[in-house]
Amino acid sequence: MSSKGDLSKCRNIGIMAHIDAGKTTTTERILFYTGKQNRIGEVHEGAASMDWMEQEKERGITITSAATTCFWNGCRINIIDTPGHVDFTVEVERSLRVLDGAVAVFDGVAGVEPQSETVWRQADRYDVPRICFVNKMDRVGADFYTCVDMIVDRLGAVPLVLQLPIGVDKGFVGVVDLVEMRSIIWEEDSLGAKFHYGDIPEGMLEEANKYRSKLVETAVEVDDEAMSMYLDGQDISVSLLKKCIRAGVIGSNFVPVLCGSAFKNKGVQPLLDAVVDYLPSPNDIPTIEGVSAKDPDQVMQITTSEDGKFVALAFKVMVDRFVGSLTFVRVYSGKLTGKSVVLNSSKGHTESVGRILLMHANNREDISEVKAGDIAALAGLKKTTTGDTLCDQNFPVILEKMDFPESVMELAIEPVSTADQEKMGMALSRLVAEDPSLKVFVNNESGQTILKGMGELHLEIIVDRMRREFGVEASVGAPQVAYRETITKAAEVEYIHKKQTGGAGQFAKVNILFEPLPPGSGFEFENKITCGAIPKEYIPGIQNGLELIKETGIIAGFPLIDFKATLFDGAFHEVDSSPLAFELAAKGAFREMASKAAPVLLEPIMRVEIITPDEYMGDVIGDINSRRGKVSEMQDRHNAKLITAFIPLSSMFGYVKDLRSMSQGRAQYSMFFARYERVPENVVVNDVKR
């Protein structure tokens, strides 16, 4: 996105929240009030411009992050609207990685919901400054003050209340601005475009003064001059107060909290003011660190400047039917023009940039260049994938990559005809390039193609996109749980691979210690060979053999995780040894280890949060117990109960129908991956073997 003006007038922000909190509705109002579009697109009508995919329009949810640009008070705002459903949390992860700030939207009735916690932790991981917007204040049961308390209790954040709601439920008409100490009332017949300032309602003066005092007391703590003035009893001016709030937001000392109703067109303009006043510009972000592509131990500092060497991070790949592959990038330094050649330092090859595009959802506008602080889409890149660094060929640097969560569900898919076979291969390769959380592999025993994803909805969307966008007709199996395996005992194995077929043979001997690791550790390989028992050129073959065979597991063909393999001895033959021989020896040692290391099956455990009316609580808890679940917490929530439980994923298929049935459609739930746990010995796992 081409810069216009200096970087201090630029904001790169994301809109994030739990599903149905009103993220896309808020974004649509932002685009309307900033003049980006001349009509308001409603999500429930399938007309939201940011939800452009057919699946998004049909379901009324955001599936893929969409980028756009608008202007407010002379400031350029690059916005990424992210999904709220847990199955698409990868879209949030890669967006937050490249953003300077975020607006967290909360449902004024439900408060801080499970996915709100997930995206908040993601923002914590990348140190993204935030503003909170408590939405849906016009809804019956909306409670601004409870939401503020939940921001403390569930997110561990320090809320800085900047507004108070005027009126409740359908009587919500505006807000008290605690910074300027005035009221803001919106005119109903102007679609929220017109509003007026006034005095604070007399009945709210005492409360407003109390919250204003808290606001000033908290804000001045980040500025020595302001703190000194405050302690001396001097008034803090509005400009100084805003300066303190901005410094505190950028330093992650607190999070401003505003409120409104995006659907009823109230509260959006002050939210835009807060984005401009308090969220950081690219200039406010500390120097970005990377490592040298030539020497990974050498740390390199990248300063945000148009005059520096070009450095950008590819955070999203999208296939456009008219343009082909589009690579979304955040530029951290330098500038780039069309028809340029850049270095993909992550993969070690150059890429030719064809066109540079400014995006508004799925609409494109050609621009001549992109500069530091901008977000843009590049056409023409062939091999660049999510997380790759693009840079000047004379400045080979690699930025920190992104980590994506483990896939927990899989299904088998087969083309219905030979003609569909080739189309399916092409479709899956493109979808995998777009989506880092989608994994595709072929089962060696059955020959079936297996898709692995984040949940039922994720896989359902993938299959639907194959059919609609690529014309692939395929038979789809029922979703299956993605089990894992691990070992519970240490085992020392000596294995000799020896084969003589005339001429040069094969010989490799390895001594490997296999040990269990704590949950979440993954796989570790350590080479402790000394005195040249195995030449160093054969070590990669051993590690590669273990990397490959661990994916086939021991018990039922599921990947083995959370273990360490230590190579401590071995032998080689001057003529018959080779990297392949040692790879085969490592695989043989792994198979021999199976009978000694007490392998067990692991299953994904989900954190399930259920909100149910009090009268159905007994039935819901009884059902949780029948699913091998464990209730960990219960909280009161507006004449309802919030139940948090940990339940095996294998027991959750069809739960949405069962919950509706037992609660007459009044209960709802959210589900998130928590961890892997050992499958109890008394539990029979049906059809678990691949």
Swiss-Prot record:
Its main location: cytoplasm. Coiled coil: none annotated. InterPro entries: EF-G-like_DII, EFG_II, EFG_III, EFG_III/V, EFG_IV, EFG_V, EFG_V-like, G_TR_CS. GO terms for molecular function: GTP binding; GTPase activity; translation elongation factor activity. The keyword Nucleotide-binding applies. Transmembrane segments: none annotated. GO terms for cellular component: cytoplasm. GTP binds at residues 17-24, 81-85, 135-138. SUPFAM superfamilies: EF-G C-terminal domain-like (SSF54980), P-loop containing nucleoside triphosphate hydrolases (SSF52540), Ribosomal protein S5 domain 2-like (SSF54211), Translation proteins (SSF50447). Signal peptide: none annotated. Pfam families: EF-G_D2, EFG_C, EFG_III, EFG_IV, GTP_EFTU. Residues 8-283 form the tr-type G domain. SMART domains: EFG_C, EFG_IV. One of its GO terms (biological process) is ribosome disassembly. It is found in: Cytoplasm. Gene3D superfamilies: 3.30.230.10, 3.30.70.240, Elongation Factor G (Translational Gtpase), domain 3, P-loop containing nucleotide triphosphate hydrolases, Translation factors. Keywords: Cytoplasm, Elongation factor, GTP-binding, Nucleotide-binding, Protein biosynthesis. Catalyzes the GTP-dependent ribosomal translocation step during translation elongation. During this step, the ribosome changes from the pre-translocational (PRE) to the post-translocational (POST) state as the newly formed A-site-bound peptidyl-tRNA and P-site-bound deacylated tRNA move to the P and E sites, respectively. Catalyzes the coordinated movement of the two tRNA molecules, the mRNA and conformational changes in the ribosome. PANTHER family: RIBOSOME-RELEASING FACTOR 2, MITOCHONDRIAL, TRANSLATION ELONGATION FACTOR G-RELATED. Belongs to the TRAFAC class translation factor GTPase superfamily. Classic translation factor GTPase family. EF-G/EF-2 subfamily. This is Elongation factor G. It comes from Anaplasma phagocytophilum (strain HZ).
